[in-house]
């Protein structure tokens, strides 16, 4: 019989499960720590999604809650960087409070099209500042570096657009 199992995709732990007969043991921490050790060789952070009722198990292993959607999901993270670091970086890019209104757009731009450009130009015309988040995850046909360069070139003429990397937290 299998005592415990777990897997990962990218930097996300998935399908961590422990058999009923082994829940009073350290089986979950053995599986999770093994996966963390593997992932930390190539990533600076590890994420886990779980039910809020089981989030405490991950917190006892050093994970920190990022967000919760009761009663379905809790997102937790572990590693050398955290959402606080990401938020600090965003704050450093914030426009002065006098610049209003502020808008935000999240794009993947796989690839950057005239439709994307129109959307961003329209937002820029209606807002004092537009924060343009480009999804950083590399699951697209075009790699992030290429998409970033296309968005940079396509918005260079818009002085009130602040280009931001989505990091591991922004999805579209």
Label for each model-derived stretch:
Residues 12, 53-54:
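A generic "binding-loop/recognition-motif" signal
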Residues 13-17, 38, 135-136:
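Glycine-/proline-rich flexible loop or hinge segments
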Residues 37-53:
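Conserved GNAT acetyl-CoA-binding A-motif
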Residues 8-12, 41-44, 125-129, 157-159:
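Short glycine/proline-enriched coil/turn segments at helix->beta-strand junctions
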Residues 24-37, 60, 116-121:
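Conserved acetyl-CoA-binding loop-helix of GNAT-fold acetyltransferases
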Residues 1-17:
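Conserved beta-strand in the GNAT
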Residues 15, 19-30, 56:
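Conserved glycine-rich acetyl-CoA-binding loop
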Residues 50, 58-63, 68-172:
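Nucleotidyltransferase catalytic core that binds NTPs
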